[in-house]
Every structure is written in structure tokens, then in C-alpha cells.
Design a protein with these regions (language model features):
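Active-site-proximal beta-strand elements of phosphoester/diester hydrolases
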Residues: 1-10, 26, 106-118, 156-161, ...
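Core catalytic region of metal-dependent phosphoesterases/phosphodiesterases
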Residues: 6-100
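Short, Asp-centered acidic motifs that coordinate Mg2+ and/or phosphate
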Residues: 22, 155-157, 200-201
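Conserved beta-sheet core of the metallophosphoesterase superfamily
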Residues: 60-64, 167-243
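Charged helix-capping and loop-helix junction motifs
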Residues: 39-49, 77-80, 126-127, 175-176, ...
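Short acidic-hydrophobic surface loop/beta-edge motif
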Residues: 92-104, 212-217, 241
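Catalytic metal-binding/acid-base residues of hydrolase active sites
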Residues: 10, 30, 67-70, 95-96, ...
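Active-site-proximal loop/helix segment associated with metal-binding centers of metalloenzymes
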Residues: 33-37, 102-184
């Protein structure tokens, strides 16, 4: 299956340059100017984002929220209802499976918006809380692997907003004044989850200018797919890959 992955649009809805089977969106979708305002965010998702997403040259859109998506934190169920009847699937610490016709491969996608806490942003929970959520996620993934593996080959994708600690978590943009340019600032609970879950690939955003080339963590390929730099200017192209 051909995937295309993006993150950290912050309201910039550029059309995909090439078709794919599935679009993965790793959060921070809403414009910065609307992020704290429920009425404006709701209208933007309904009138701008959903029409854009449904017009992209893909069969399925799978997405999580990010720390700027306050409306999704408060009204995720309402957004899911908005998406009913479309091919947009919104995940909040959930596992789904997708497949292609006449193909023995099935793809399990676990999506989480949870981020390492700093400041007063959306979906930021203490790491112990996150570990409990991820323990439930791991149990669900392993149960489904056991059920499905006799009949299908299973590939797994972890779609997260945050970056895991230790890989793909060093910001490279020198103009980022609050950062020393060398410290790992990823999410330790997420890194532990990856080590235990062993997905084929982790797609993330959040840290805009970390390395966009693949890095490895415990056998899992980790890729940052943010579109913008730390100044919120478009700096990267969508990431295409096959699995």
C-alpha cells in the first residue's frame, strides 16, 4: 500500500502532489489564529478541512490531533460525527485496520495525540498517565495480531503527534531560541510504547525541524513528517512510502 504522511499544517491546506492509497495526518491541523476558539475552529474543520481532505487523491485519510488542536481535545466525538460518510478516520488512542481488495496484507494503525507535558497545551498528559493509555493500546494491538495473524500478514503503523525520546527529536533549526540545539526532547513514554509494540513505522510531527530522514528505534522506522519549520513557514514536502 502506498502511504503519504504529513503533519503540522497549522491551517495551510496544500494539495498533495501525487496520489496515494492512504493519507496519514499526525496532528496540529487547525490554524494558529483559531486554535483557542471553539466556534471558529469548528467552522474551519467543517468548511475548510473536511472538504480539502475529501478532495485529496487518496482512498482513506487517517488522522490524529496535536497539541494546538484544542477543539479536537474537547469535541473529538463531534468531529467524528462531522466526518461520518466520508473516508476520514479520526483516532484518539485507538486502533483501526485497513486493507486493500485482493491483498492478504492488513494494516493496523494505532493513533495517539498524547504529548510530553510542557505549558498549557492540548493533549498533554503526565507520562504515567500516558503509560497506562499505551499499556491498553499494546494489549489491543497484541490481541488483534493474535486474532488476525492466522489469516493475514499484518503491518502496523504508530501515528503519533509527539516524537519518541532518543530519535528524531533534536531540533535542527538554529533560529529556535529556546532550545540548545543538541538535547533530546522527545517523549519517553512513547519511546517505551514503540519498543514494546514494535510497529513497522512510527509517523510523527510536533517538532517541526527534526531530521526528516528515517531513523531507527528498536527495529521501528521513525519519521518526522512536519510540513513547516519553527517559524511556521512551509519547508518540507509530504512524505511518501510503501509498506
Amino acid at each position: 500500500m502506498k502511504f503519504v504522511a504529513i503533519s503540522d499544517q497549522h491551517g495551510i491546506l496544500k494539495d498533495l502532489p501525487q496520489p496515494a492509497d492512504t493519507l496519514l495526518i499526525a496532528g496540529d491541523v487547525v490554524p494558529l489564529r483559531f486554535q483557542c476558539y471553539s466556534k471558529e475552529s469548528k467552522k474551519w474543520f467543517k468548511e475548510k478541512f473536511i472538504p480539502w481532505a475529501t478532495e485529496q487523491p487518496v482512498h482513506t485519510v487517517v488522522m490524529v490531533a496535536g497539541n494546538h488542536d484544542f477543539w479536537l481535545e474537547r469535541h473529538g466525538d463531534e468531529f467524528e460525527e462531522m466526518c461520518r460518510g466520508t473516508h476520514i478516520l479520526y483516532l484518539e488512542n485507538e486502533l483501526i485496520f485497513i486493507s486493500q481488495e485482493n491483498n492478504n496484507l492488513v494494516y493496523g494503525i494505532y493513533g495517539t495525540p498524547l504529548c510530553k507535558p510542557f505549558g498549557n497545551w492540548a493533549f498533554m498528559k503526565e507520562l504515567e498517565y500516558q503509560r497506562k493509555v499505551f499499556d491498553k493500546g499494546l494489549k489491543s494491538v497484541n490481541e488483534q495480531r493474535e486474532i488476525r495473524s492466522p489469516f493475514s500478514e499484518i503491518k502496523t503503523i504508530l501515528l503519533s503527534h509527539d516524537a519518541p525520546y532518543g530519535v528524531s527529536d533534536i531540533i535542527q533549526q538554529k533560529s529556535c531560541s529556546w532550545y540548545d540545539g543538541k538535547s533530546h526532547i522527545g517523549n519517553k513514554a512513547l519511546a517505551e510504547f514503540i519498543t514494546e509494540m514494535k510497529p513497522d513505522i512510527n509517523i510523527h510531527g510536533h517538532l517541526h525541524t527534526t531530521n526528516h530522514d528515517p531513523e531507527m528505534l528498536a527495529g521501528t522506522e521513525v519519521r518526522c513528517v512536519s510540513l513547516l519549520d519553527e517559524d511556521y513557514e512551509v519547508a518540507y514536502e509530504p512524505t511518501y512510502f510503501e509498506l
